[in-house]
Amino acid sequence: MASRSGRLIVWFLYTLLVIAVFFCLLSPLAGTAVSRETSAQTGEKVITEAEAICDVKRETCVPSPGPGVASIVSMTYLGKGLRLRETRAHEAKSDLGEKYRVRYSENNGRTWSAWAPVALGTDTLRQNDTYMEESPFAIAYDPAADRTIEVLFRRIFLGEPSAVLAAFWRGERRFADHCSYRFSKNDGRTWTEPRQLVYEGGSVFNPKNWADPDFFQANQMYGSYDITPLSDGRIAYPAVVSVPYREEEEERKICAKVPWYAGKDRVEGVGCFFGKWNPRENDYDWTFSKPVFVPRKVSTRGLEEPTVTELRGGKLLLEMRGSNVYLDPVLFPGRKWISVSADGGKTWSAVVDFRYDTGEPFYAPATFAKFIRSRRTNKLYWIGNISRSPAEGNGPRYPLYIAEVDEQKVALMKKTLTVIDDLQPGDTKDLQLSNFTLLENRVTLDFEIYLSRFGEKPGNIFSANAYRYLLRLK
């Protein structure tokens, strides 16, 4: 009898162990932080889950509609209340969305309107052999104007879009990007007609001739995904623009195989629009700062996908992605790049790499990042990709981290680095945890991320579900 009891106890303990291991394997890496102890496999310094700055929950938002097609989800508030707009689309080719549809909620997502199609993609926008893609790029409630302002992105292709984009990677540019803005005083129920953002002369968009050269060549820009209201009553909106550039002989040799993505003897720099509401004109008065840029040997594709935030004390922090594609990733490491303004954006410091508060640099792929200040903690956070080893061009696009920003040192607080998501068993090495929308839920004060995990399934990188991540700060 005693022997049988002993066997039962052993069996019971073994069963508990198996169950524990099973749930450990199921537990996502999300919500864990980078270890003060060193991993024998990667050399990465990580800390314990108990020291993570937030708890993370991931859930499937919209499954992939079929092989080779990704679900895309974007969520944003309209106005200062609880009105939400959700946009969904499909993507089967890089950077080309199709089948856009939209719905609205008046009560923070408890109930929703019916879905309505909206013409935004190249599958519906065509004029002879010219194609167009339009996309809501950035939106914010401006308390100084008491209006919701939205920036709309427009890309015009001189030819079939996927062929035009393929030619771009060879250094042939047959598309043009422009941005316009519109605003609403009734939480997005009605909008003004879009008005083009300009920083130089030239014609504005002609709906009867999308490829009008006077418009097509002038005021080209790739805008930010974020509009930032400032404490002085202005709004800030950074944008990528082309600037003249001359290589030195040494750099010419280093970059001999690098295409001129912005055009011969030009690089992509970043300037910042500042808008101040003018009640007499019922419009914004705009200024545009002198662009910052880096040599091609620092970033072969220039500075891209900028975002700006206001630090405590009023300084402005501009963060930008770079790329080391075509270069040795060890000699020319991929970084995140920053510039700081102490005079409200009139002038900007020289561009330097974003670092930890310890002074250490970190590797980063060519992906965008976002800043967000929590109303729960009043702290500023950065969300983006940091690589465990030297990044090569666009990848790897994992892990995805959140970290607190040291606003005095203008650096990431290394001890706060927390994994939101990472490469999981079953994911392919082409996994992308990089293209996302972000908001703070105005009821729960949790952060919400909407992200399509491109590369999560074998066979086709676009066979991707869209996910929602809930981040509850500790």
Task: Describe the residue ranges of each PLM region.
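N-terminal Sec-pathway targeting helices
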Residues: 2-16
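Signal peptide processing junction and immediate N-terminal pro/mature segment
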Residues: 25-40
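Asp-box/BNR beta-propeller blade signature and adjacent active/binding-site loops
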Residues: 39-474
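Short hydrophobic transmembrane-like helices used for membrane targeting/insertion
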Residues: 9-10, 18-21, 34
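Bacterial N-terminal signal peptides
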Residues: 14-28
